[in-house]
Amino acid sequence: MTTPAPSPVASEQHSAGGLVVRGDEVLLIATAGGRRWQLPKGHLEEGELPAQAAVREVREETGVTGTIVAALSGVDYTFLERGKHRIKKHVDYFLLAYESGSETDFEPREVVTARWFSRPEAIARLSHANDRRVAEQAWRIVRERQGESTAPGGNR
């Protein structure tokens, strides 16, 4: 018996996520049994703006609350859901400064753990090229702002 080909028609999804900075550290989440490190993100709820969804998803997936510092580049990609349905996904990302909370207080639906990493280690651990690109953009913004004050989420 042959496996049916994926549908050529793609449904569309819109998500939002965030890169949280605390001093010189970045917060990542592990999924897929801890084998994949990525930025927290999730679907927009009805009537929710991307920035609101990013803050909510970061809080739900990491236990950490952050304040939006800047919008980052969006990411577009296509994937197969359950090997059958083609999904076109757009994710709006935001740079967030750490505000409060603990990375041990999250909802463990899809997330295995949340952990702080140094910038170089975070970039190296991120499993997806799109996430690495977003993280590099975020750090360029952090460096630019460090000339004005301290890093987002740092001690002032």
Residue spans of the language-model regions?
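Functional cleft and adjacent loop/helix regions within the main domain
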Residues: P40, E46, A151-N155
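N-terminal strand-loop-strand
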Residues: T2-L39
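Class I (Rossmann-like) S-adenosyl-L-methionine-dependent methyltransferase catalytic domain
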Residues: T2-V9, F79-R82, R156
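Residue-level signature of transmembrane alpha-helix interfaces in integral membrane proteins
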Residues: P8, K41, F79, V134-E136, ...
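Charged phosphate-binding loop/patch that engages nucleotide di/tri-phosphates or the phosphate backbone
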Residues: A124-R156
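Unchanged
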Residues: L44-R133
